């Protein structure tokens, strides 16, 4: 029932002085956005500006939006095996755009494990609380 509670929560306000910008979405063909929405709201409450690109999003859209908004982090929700299979395309798009070492990649979801994220050079959040803490630590390291 915690997912229902999180979906019924009010939309948090935009932070006045964001600690970072996060592009967040579900990689295609994943249409399950309940967890992504919970993470997005939690990031917003923690002081991040969030740019939601939606569900079933092509890898290049994440890249384009990250460049357009000068994002610090791309956060992915990966809840299906076909979506997991598209992570290699995202990795290639990050490399082609020259963003692989410039933007933090955080992922989580039912179809992915920590080992999958690590293999891509990404960080893994098993839940919304862990995802927010990882994002905060990433920004703290970036500010140094």
Question: Language-model features: where?
Answer:
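Short acidic-hydrophobic, aromatic-tinged amphipathic segments that line or gate anion-handling sites
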Residues: 123-128
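N-terminal ligand-binding lobe of clamshell/alpha-beta domains
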Residues: 29-33
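Long amphipathic alpha-helical segments
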Residues: 1-16
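Cofactor-cradling patches in redox/metallo enzymes
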Residues: 42-46, 52-122
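Short, solvent-exposed amphipathic alpha-helices that sit
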Residues: 34-42
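Short hydrophobic segments within beta-strands
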Residues: 24-27
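Phosphate-coordination loops involved in phosphoryl transfer and adenosine-cofactor binding
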Residues: 18-21, 102
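A charged, well-structured terminal subsegment
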Residues: 134-144
């Amino acid at each position: 029932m915690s997912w229902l509670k999180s979906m019924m929560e009010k939309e948090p306000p935009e932070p006045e002085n964001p600690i970072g910008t996060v592009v967040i979405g579900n990689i295609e063909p994943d249409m399950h956005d309940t967890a992504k929405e919970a993470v997005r709201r939690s990031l917003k409450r923690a002081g991040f500006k969030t740019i939601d690109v939606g569900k079933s999003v092509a890898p290049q859209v994440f890249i384009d939006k990250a460049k357009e908004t000068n994002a610090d982090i791309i956060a992915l929700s990966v809840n299906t095996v076909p979506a997991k299979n598209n992570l290699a395309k995202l990795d290639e798009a990050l490399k082609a755009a020259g963003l692989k070492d410039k933007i933090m990649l955080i992922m989580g979801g039912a179809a992915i494990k920590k080992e999958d994220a690590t293999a891509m050079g990404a960080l893994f959040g098993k839940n919304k609380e862990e995802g927010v803490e990882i994002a905060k630590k990433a920004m703290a390291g970036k500010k140094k």
